[in-house]
Curated annotation (Swiss-Prot):
This is Ribosomal protein L11 methyltransferase. The lineage of its organism: Bacteria, Pseudomonadati, Campylobacterota, Epsilonproteobacteria, Campylobacterales. It comes from Helicobacter hepaticus (strain ATCC 51449 / 3B1). It comes from the Bacteria. Belongs to the methyltransferase superfamily. PrmA family. InterPro entries: Ribosomal_L11_MeTrfase_PrmA, Ribosomal_PrmA_MeTrfase, SAM-dependent_MTases_sf.
Length: 317
């Protein structure tokens, strides 16, 4: 066993999932994953028919089957960083102590397999391909520069903040590509990675952006620097939290956010959008399309776009 291998340990407690999870994290100092399994007789039969699964302390299959969400805990630990036998003994001791403290039966079953390490970073990078949306070519920093005559945007995907691959982001980029926003004021609500703000800067707009998520603001700042553009203002919060010096009205507002929040912000959009300005709404599932259109019936519809079950709307006052 060496650093080129790791242990994959799958543990299925009969109960007390949170307590088992806390113990495993403290014991290994490693991240864990959860896998929810189907609480069906056939699935549990597969577990117990497989000789690689071991039952400890009379693991109660009936109790596990009746739990609301049977869950397996998966931990991956470098082989040279743990004595697997010591770990299992400590886990069994923990289960015994938990049983004594709760006056309940506590058992678990487990499956252990030694696996070879995999270059997850390279595999991840290989899975992220550049994408073309309207006038824009979006690529991660490890991809080569584009040779065609597109406006290039560099985004290193992080979390779920927008990299151009999702339909809702792509439709916003396509709408912006069709517009002349040179010199116009634009507000990006829920800016996420900053991809729409960066695109708008490259189209010559004076860009203001906000997001309620602190991590999104951090990612946006990183990507702004990566692309060599400058926003007029970027703040954590919503429209109502605009900093001093921000426009009272915007020529363009773009909001790629969930439908529920779109409805909540209706009055803010109406207050902040200039007369004859353009409001782009995206992040709307097709099933909520008419609900949003009804909520914004005091706006005039300029265009709609549908892609992969998602909808984007272009509106004006």
């Amino acid at each position: 066993m060496d650093k080129q291998t790791y242990w994959e340990i799958i543990i299925h407690p009969s109960d007390f999932l949170d307590q088992f999870t806390d113990f495993i994290i403290q014991k290994t100092s490693c991240a864990i994953e959860f896998f929810d399994i189907l609480p069906t007789p056939s699935h549990f039969a597969i577990i117990y028919d497989d000789a690689s699964w071991q039952s400890v302390l009379g693991f109660d299959i009936l109790k596990a089957k009746k739990s609301k969400q049977p869950t397996q805990i998966v931990s991956r630990i470098a082989s040279n960083e743990i004595n697997i036998q010591d770990f299992l003994e400590s886990l069994q001791h923990f289960a015994l102590m938990l049983a004594q403290n709760t006056q309940d039966s506590v058992g678990f079953c487990y499956h252990i397999e030694e696996k070879f390490n995999y270059d997850w970073i390279k595999a991840y990078q290989d899975s992220i391909e550049p994408v073309q949306c309207g006038r824009f070519y979006i690529r991660p920093s490890w991809e080569q520069e584009v040779k065609e005559s597109y406006d290039e945007i560099i985004i290193n995907p992080a979390f779920a903040f927008g990299s151009g691959h999702h339909a809702s982001t792509a439709m916003c980029l396509e709408f912006l590509s069709e517009m002349n926003i040179q010199g116009k004021t634009l507000l990006d609500v829920g800016c996420g990675s900053g991809i729409l703000s960066i695109a708008s800067c490259k189209l010559g707009a004076q860009v203001y952006a906000c997001d309620t998520d602190e991590n999104a603001i951090k990612e946006c700042n990183k990507n702004i620097l990566l692309n060599g553009v400058m926003l007029n203002a970027l703040w954590q919060g919503s429209i109502a939290d605009s900093p001093m010096g921000a426009p009272q009205k915007y020529d363009v507002i773009v909001a790629n956010i969930v439908a529920f929040i779109v409805k909540v912000l209706h009055n803010d959009f109406r207050t902040k959008l200039a007369k004859n300005g353009v409001l782009i709404l995206s992040g709307i599932l097709d099933e909520y399309k008419f609900d949003i259109i009804k909520a914004f019936n005091d706006f005039d519809m300029l265009d709609t776009c549908c892609k992969d079950g998602w909808v984007a709307l272009k509106l004006t006052l």
